Amino acid sequence: MGKRLRQQRRGKGSKAYSKRPGTFDISVNYPYNTKASKEGEVTRLFNHTGHTAPLMEIEYDDFTNGNMIAPEGIKVHDKVYIGKETFTLGSVCRIGDIPEGMPVYNIESTPGDGGKLVRSAGSTAYITAHLSGATNVTLPSRASVVLNDDCRAQLGAVAGGGMTDQPLVKAGKSHYIMHATNRMWPKIRGVKSNPVDHPFGGKQHHKGKSSMTSRNAPPGRKVGHIAASRTGRRKKG
C-alpha cells in the first residue's frame, strides 16, 4: 500500500506542519496613531527567530516601549524620531515628507498598517518621485509602486545584509534554518520519489506516463495536471 502524499500529510494538521509556538511573539510595527510625534532611544539590539533582520527595542519619551526593524549603522543610545520631519537613521516619517533619493525600508502599503514592504535583511527602497498626493517608491526588485503620501517608512537600509554571505556548507544547517521558519523543505519532484511515495515515482514505466489526472481521481492519486484541457506549449496555427 502506498504512503500518503505530502499534501495529505499537510492537510491533516499535525505539529510537523504547524507554526512553532512563540516564533512571532514580538510585535514589530509603528504606533497605531499615525498623527503621533514621539522621540525614543534605542535600548537594545537583538535577533529574533521570526525575522531575518536584527530588531531594536526603543524606549519612548512617554515611557512606553516598542520594537522596530534595525537599520544598518544604528547603535544603542541613538535617538529615533517618529512623526517628526527629522531625517535621522531609523526614524519614521511620512513618505510624502521624505526627500527624493533617500533610502527607506519597512514601508506601509496603506496608512496605519504598521509596515508591510521591504522588511528583510539587507533590503532597501528609494523615494524616486513625489506626485499629487502620492509618492513613487522603487523597491529592491526595481519595480515601482505609487503609495499614499500618508504612508510611513523608516530611513536607511535594513541591517543584516551579509547574512547570506557565509555558505551553509551542509544540509543539516539548512534543515534547522528552514524548520525555524516553517518552510516546506526539502521539496522534491514526484518523478524522483519511490513508487510507494508518489504515483509518478519509480524507475520503471516513467517514460510516456501522462501527468494528467481525472477530476474524479481518489485522494492519493490526484496529483499532476488535474482535469487539464492541455499541457505544454500552445500549438501554433
Regions found by a protein language model. Name each.
Residues 50-52, 58-60:
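Structural recognition of beta-strand segments within beta-rich domains
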Residues 60-63, 141:
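Short acidic-glycine loop/turn motifs at beta-strand connectors
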Residues 56-57, 135:
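Short, hydrophobic/aromatic-rich beta-strand segments within well-structured domains
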Residues 63-75:
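Beta-strand/loop nucleic-acid-binding surfaces
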Residues 1-51, 76-237:
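Basic, glycine/proline-rich low-complexity segments that contact nucleic acids
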Residues 54-56, 69-70:
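Short N-terminal amphipathic alpha-helices
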Residues 60, 70, 129:
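Conserved strand-loop elements at the edges of beta-sheets that form or border functional pockets
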